[in-house]
Every structure is written in structure tokens, then in C-alpha cells.
Regions:
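Catalytic core of pol beta-like nucleotidyltransferases
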Residues: 2-134, 143-320
Length: 320
């Protein structure tokens, strides 16, 4: 078990080093990853639930001689040797992210009035507080089952009218509406990178749906056995009588399945004919349960995993 903990602490720090992300001891423990092979499968000996406590992880970080060959620490953050600069970079990105959070909250306060919206969560770089000056702002939006196309259109129109929608070359501080799911909480992409993305989600509207999202996606713990949805992830934006009333009126007005079918057929056709949907290595999901648009997906999840494997292999070979 001790060798497993050593291997998985190292793997965790290497994985996040690829993303230029130094980690606190608590983060190393919470996001501790399992051993994986080249196909993103699991080490057969690591499939059982391991009892790796925060105290054990902290002890290994501070005292394990094997780990000390590879890692260093500064100001409470751990990282690979020679990467001290990541700490200052993370602190700077934290400041940038805090400023961008205000933009997201401003938009989300309006989106909560849109019919069928059930949850709004911050995703991507902003969720990890690693946004850069020119970063866009990713949201995951959950909508009532059976109304994903109606709700997506309404949200897109509203965010565009607010002048905050990302489109064309307008990227910085713009809302990227690239992921919608229904309250069935079906997630198609289930890999190491996706587990990272969903671990860091930050709900800003409707915490009840967020908890149900994690309960419906316990596959995340196959990659992150210590991760669990914590009570400190509370919604920042509360529902109000007015927002509930407007949603209720809108949902009654738009309740016809014919509207959803027409909008669904139109949007599916538009998505299919979009040149970005044909991008090699992209991941485009267009179903009644999930709408996801990642034309550059190959350079995200798969690329991160390949760099992670190569870096981990090089470290192990260098110290043999």
C-alpha cells in the first residue's frame, strides 16, 4: 500500500504539473489519482478503495525520501523540482480569476430567470482559479430533461444580448456556452481529464442539482478515489420568488413538445453543418441529454494525458 501511495502522489503532482498547477497538501489528497495504463485503464491492484488519509498523504509529502527526489515545496504548495515559478504564477492567476468571477456572477444572475435552467456551474480554468488575462469563461448549465434545445437557444440569446457571449474573435471575458446537460446528468466523456474538470466544478446557482449531478456521476471516483462533493461548494446566487415566477410562466408558455422538436431538429442540423464539427480530434455531442462542443478536445484531455505519461516515464527512467 505504501508503494501505491508514493506512486499515486507522484502521478498526481506530475499530472497537474502538465497543467502548470502546484498543489496544496489538501489538494494532493482530495484529487489523488489512481495508477493508469496507456489506455487510461486502471492498475488492477489499485481497483479496491484505498484508505489514504490526509495525514498519510501529508506525511509522505514531508518525509518520503523517494518522493523528495522528484518534488519540492514553497509557501505551502508542492510541485516537481525545478518548477518553483509555478507558485507565483498560480497566485497571480488566482487574482485574475477573482476579477473574472464577478463577470460570471453578473451573467448568471440573469440566466437564472431563463425557463428550464436548473443549475449553473463554473468550469474550466476559472473553476481552478487558473484563468489568464485573455481567458474566456466556461459554464456548465443543467436544464430540465426534455428541454435542452429550447433552453440552450434562450440562454444563448440572453447572453448575446448582454454582450457577454463568446463568438468569432471575441474571447476575453466572454461566456463560453459549450456544455449543456439535462437533469438526468448524463456525461459522455469519462476519462482522466474529464474527472479533473468535474472535480473542480463550482456551482453558482442551485446546489441541490449539483449534488445530484455528483451522485449520478460516481465514476469520477474511479479516477479520484478521495474525491467527494463537499458541503462548502454552496451556490452563491440564490433563487428568488421573481426568478421562480418568471421561469414558471416561461415554462408554461413553452411547454409544447413540438417547440422542442422543431428547435432540436434545427440546432442538430446547424451543428452538423458547422465546419468546426468536422475538426479532426474534436468532440461534439448533440443529443437530447447533452450538448457539448469541444472542437479542440484532442489538445485538451488526450494531449494532457500523453504529456503526463511521458513526463512520468521520464522521471522514473531518470532515477532508475
Amino acid at each position: 500500500m505504501h508503494d501505491k501511495l508514493y506512486k499515486n502522489i507522484l502521478a498526481t503532482l506530475v499530472y497537474y504539473d502538465v497543467m502548470d498547477y502546484p498543489m496544496t497538501p489538501f489538494e494532493v489528497w482530495k484529487y489523488l489519482i489512481r495508477s493508469v495504463d496507456k489506455n487510461q485503464g486502471f492498475d488492477e491492484d489499485f481497483m479496491e478503495k484505498e484508505d489514504f488519509s490526509l495525514a498519510k498523504v501529508l506525511a509522505y509529502l514531508e518525509k518520503n525520501d523517494k518522493l523528495k527526489k522528484y518534488i519540492d515545496s514553497k509557501n505551502g504548495y508542492y510541485f516537481l523540482k525545478g518548477r518553483n515559478d509555478l507558485v507565483e504564477k498560480r497566485l497571480e492567476k488566482n487574482k485574475i480569476s477573482e476579477k473574472k468571477l464577478g463577470i460570471v456572477l453578473e451573467v448568471a444572475r440573469v440566466i437564472r430567470f431563463v425557463p428550464y435552467v436548473r443549475m449553473i456551474a463554473i468550469a474550466g480554468r476559472l473553476a481552478t482559479k487558473s484563468a489568464e488575462k485573455n481567458s474566456d469563461l466556461d459554464l456548465l448549465i443543467a436544464v430540465k430533461h426534455g428541454k435542452v434545445f429550447t433552453c440552450r437557444l434562450l440562454v444563448t440569446i440572453i447572453v448575446h444580448l448582454l454582450g457577454k457571449r463568446r463568438h468569432n474573435n471575441k474571447i476575453k471575458d466572454r461566456i463560453c456556452l459549450n456544455h449543456f446537460i439535462t437533469t438526468k446528468f448524463t456525461i459522455s466523456a469519462r476519462d482522466m481529464f474529464s474527472s479533473h474538470e468535474y472535480c473542480f466544478l463550482k456551482p453558482i446557482f442551485d446546489n441541490d442539482s449539483f449534488m445530484r449531478f455528483h451522485n449520478s456521476n460516481d465514476w469520477i471516483q474511479n479516477y479520484r478515489p478521495n474525491f467527494s462533493h463537499s458541503s462548502d461548494n454552496i451556490s452563491i446566487i440564490k433563487d428568488s420568488r421573481l426568478s421562480r415566477l418568471i421561469r414558471r410562466i416561461g415554462e408554461k408558455t413553452l411547454q409544447s413538445d413540438l417547440i422542442e422538436n422543431i428547435l432540436g431538429n434545427w440546432q442538430k442540423k446547424k451543428i452538423k453543418n458547422n465546419p468546426k464539427s468536422q475538426t479532426i480530434g474534436g468532440l461534439i455531442i448533440s443529443s437530447d441529454e447533452e450538448l457539448a462542443f469541444w472542437p479542440n478536445f484532442e489538445n485538451q484531455g488526450p494531449a494532457v494525458f500523453e504529456k503526463f505519461q511521458n513526463k512520468l516515464r521520464n522521471l522514473e527512467n531518470h532515477n532508475q
